[in-house]
Curated annotation (Swiss-Prot):
Keywords: Isoprene biosynthesis, Magnesium, Metal-binding, Thiamine biosynthesis, Thiamine pyrophosphate, Transferase. GO terms for biological process: 1-deoxy-D-xylulose 5-phosphate biosynthetic process; isopentenyl diphosphate biosynthetic process, methylerythritol 4-phosphate pathway; terpenoid biosynthetic process; thiamine biosynthetic process. SMART domains: Transket_pyr. The keyword Zinc-finger does not apply. The lineage of its organism: Bacteria, Pseudomonadati, Chlamydiota, Chlamydiia, Parachlamydiales. Thiamine diphosphate binds at residues 75, 116-118, 148-149, 176, 369. Pathway: Metabolic intermediate biosynthesis; 1-deoxy-D-xylulose 5-phosphate biosynthesis; 1-deoxy-D-xylulose 5-phosphate from D-glyceraldehyde 3-phosphate and pyruvate: step 1/1. PANTHER family: 1-D-DEOXYXYLULOSE 5-PHOSPHATE SYNTHASE-RELATED, 1-DEOXY-D-XYLULOSE-5-PHOSPHATE SYNTHASE, CHLOROPLASTIC. Its cofactor is Mg(2+); thiamine diphosphate. InterPro entries: Dxylulose-5-P_synthase (IPR005477), THDP-binding (IPR029061), Transketo_C/PFOR_II (IPR009014), Transketolase-like_Pyr-bd (IPR005475), Transketolase_C (IPR033248), Transketolase_CS (IPR049557). This is 1-deoxy-D-xylulose-5-phosphate synthase. GO terms for cellular component: cytosol. It comes from Protochlamydia amoebophila (strain UWE25).
Length: 635
């Protein structure tokens, strides 16, 4: 049995003297370690299996942390973590108080940014390189970007800002979808210069004119000549594309050949200009199931490490996104004016069936959130189409100005289906959807609503187009009750009293009503009968209902899985002041003004006090309540 190499690695320098046969065995060990841990924890599997040799080559050639690897999105840094002293904690990845699933500077000096959103690496790297040059340092800056990153406007802006004089700047294009031409060799470089040369183009045009005049065969020869030229252009397009930005293009290179990668990286270290190395990798390399289905194994759920098959999921209820996706499809089958738009999240947002059924009415614009929102505004212009922009809450942050300038200011009736609203568990602080109410509430004309269950979600979806205003319907990725009752029209801005009592009014947003009802039961055991109100609408608030309830309630508790800063609680506080309810005592509960870490949702909620027992205790403490009987319902 071969002795483990991985278990004896303490620093990335430890791999520099390994033979290529040892590196091959280490790559095998790394893949087995990733598969073993993620079979239990879940996580970004396919992309990490695909970058093993690339990461080994980078650490073999460069000196981390002095030389800086800046990973775009950084969900593919598991191998990097294993090589930089975190193997002993790798079993904790994405777990509460464990390793982050993305790069994180607080975790290691080898991680330079806490990333999680796409398209940022190149801009960050250029900034780091400028800092290096101004401070007269000589370290290498190596941004690692994916092929999908090239759809990001931010990446294109950064490309446009690259200087030809920039040295020790090496961009790695990790192409795991082979979406860019994979033709290779010196001929690519030669033809790129030849076909982009104005003189060559002029000669081609003149020859085409002469050939086309040949009797009988002229048009055929001319047509074939055009086909050959277009083929050659496709052959060389990567070089032509990147070199116009000042980057010297090399590749494509086999991303699973460690020696070839090392040779190329060593060869460009002394380049006098910025370089981009096009590396072809395969998502899921080393695991058959992940290779066959890289989308499902991108963010994999727990699976059998022996067979690779996903473990049975004892799901008894649908999730909010599944209800959204299936109901939107039903609506679209009845109404041909409904169009869905998504920025590269059709699978996560459960729009795949919609896309298969109505491909012309489900538009995936790629990782381009700003464009997605403004594009939605353009489609909504004129009022003949009903536009649903489906987007994760954390990614909507990237399109703040587009929502303001291109939707709300224009008074366009786009419906925002805001997925992953609330805590996003193992993905952590880069992905929690806990700020959208804060910035959307500042937008004039905007409607903000959140359903407590699948039935209310469907009713909001059915009603939203009739309001003819920008509308945000936010919901978490959690299981919920669907009910399938007849769908009633939702009146704009109207809430619902779930249980009526006196003295304490508990206002809970969306799925937090489940916790609110449990809190009410705990309060009831101490002699207090509270009212539970589901406002449904954060904007506009049901002012009539609030004013009525406040006649016999002198305490309000707001509960939301959102930042307490400018969230629902703040909105209600402003309402109370504006209406003159100055004697009302208020307790606002939500996510504190801090970056919330990663872990299971329940662990995170418990830590910040948003579970029923802790909410109950906070209510008792804040309002100085004295139990009216001796029952202590909480241990």
């Amino acid at each position: 049995m071969t002795q483990s190499i991985l278990s004896n690695l303490n620093h990335p320098n430890d791999i520099k003297n390994l033979s290529y046969s040892d590196l091959k065995y280490l790559a095998h060990e790394i893949r087995q370690r990733i598969i073993e841990v993620l079979s239990v924890n879940g996580g970004h599997l396919a992309s990490n299996l695909g970058v093993v040799e690339l990461t080994l080559a980078l650490h073999k050639v460069f000196e981390s942390p002095d030389d800086k690897f800046i990973w775009d999105v950084s969900h593919q840094t598991y191998v990097h973590k294993l090589l930089t002293g975190r193997n002993d904690r790798f079993h904790e990845i994405r777990q509460f108080k464990g390793l982050c699933g993305f790069s994180h500077p607080k975790e290691s000096i080898h991680d330079h940014f806490h990333a999680g959103h796409a398209g940022t690496a190149l801009s960050l790297a250029l900034g780091v390189a400028k800092n290096r040059d101004l401070t007269k340092r000589k370290d290498y800056i190596i941004p690692i970007i994916g092929d999908a990153t090239l759809t990001c406007g931010l990446t294109l802006e950064a490309l446009n800002n690259i200087s030809r004089e920039l040295k020790r700047f090496i961009v790695i294009l990790n192409d795991n979808a082979m979406s860019i031409s994979k033709n290779v060799g010196a001929i690519t470089h030669i033809l790129s210069r030849l076909l982009s040369n104005p003189t060559t183009n002029k000669i081609h045009q003149e020859l085409d004119t002469i050939v086309s005049k040949i009797p009988n065969y002229g048009p055929i020869l001319s047509q074939q000549g055009h086909k050959i030229t277009e083929s050659l252009k496709n052959l060389v397009s990567p070089a032509v594309y990147f070199e116009q930005y000042g980057l010297s293009y090399i590749g494509p290179i086999d991303g699973h050949d460690t020696k070839k990668l090392v040779d190329v990286l060593e060869g460009v270290k002394d380049s006098n200009w910025p370089v981009i190395i096009h590396v072809l990798t395969r998502k899921g390399e080393g695991m058959d199931e992940a290779i066959k289905n890289p989308i499902s194994y991108h963010g994999a759920k727990p699976f059998s490490k022996d067979t690779g098959k996903f473990l049975p999921n004892p799901v008894t209820k649908p999730t909010f996104p599944k209800i959204f996706g299936s109901h939107l499809l039903k609506m679209a089958e009845k109404d041909p004016s409904i169009v869905a738009i998504t920025p590269a999240m059709s699978a996560g947002s459960c729009l795949d069936d919609f896309m298969k059924t109505f491909p012309e009415r489900c538009i995936d614009v790629g990782i381009a959130e700003s464009h997605a929102i403004t594009f939605a505004g353009g489609m909504a212009y004129g009022g003949k189409m009903k536009i649903v922009a489906s987007i994760y809450a954390t990614f909507l942050q990237r399109a703040f100005d587009n929502v303001f300038h291109d939707i709300c200011l224009q008074e366009l009736p786009v419906v925002f289906a805001i997925d992953r609203a609330g805590i996003s568990g193992p993905d952590g602080s880069t992905h929690h959807g806990i700020y959208d109410i804060s910035f959307l509430n500042a937008m004039p004309n905007m409607i903000i609503a959140q359903p407590r269950n699948g039935q209310v979600l469907k009713e909001l979806m059915e009603s939203a187009f009739s309001w003819k205003r920008p509308t945000a319907i936010r919901y978490p990725n959690l299981m919920t009750e669907e009910f399938n009752h007849p769908i009633c029209e939702r009146e704009l801005g109207k809430g619902e009293v779930l249980i009526e009592g006196t003295e304490i009014l508990i206002v809970a947003l969306g799925h937090m009503n489940q916790a609110a009802l449990k809190v009410r039961d705990l309060l009831a055991q101490t002699g207090i009968e509270a009212t539970v109100l589901d406002p449904i609408f954060v904007k506009p608030l049901d002012s009539e209902l609030f004013c009525k309830l406040l006649l016999n309630h002198n305490k309000i508790v707001t509960i939301e899985e959102h930042s307490v800063v400018s969230g629902m609680g703040s909105i209600i506080n402003n309402f109370l002041v504006g209406q003159g309810f100055n004697q009302i005592q208020v307790l606002n509960l939500g996510i504190p003004e801090a970056f919330l870490d990663h872990g299971r949702n329940q662990d995170l909620l418990n830590e910040i006090g948003l579970v029923p027992e802790k909410i109950f205790r906070q209510i008792q403490s804040h309002f100085n309540l004295i139990a009216q009987n001796t029952l202590n319902p909480v241990a």
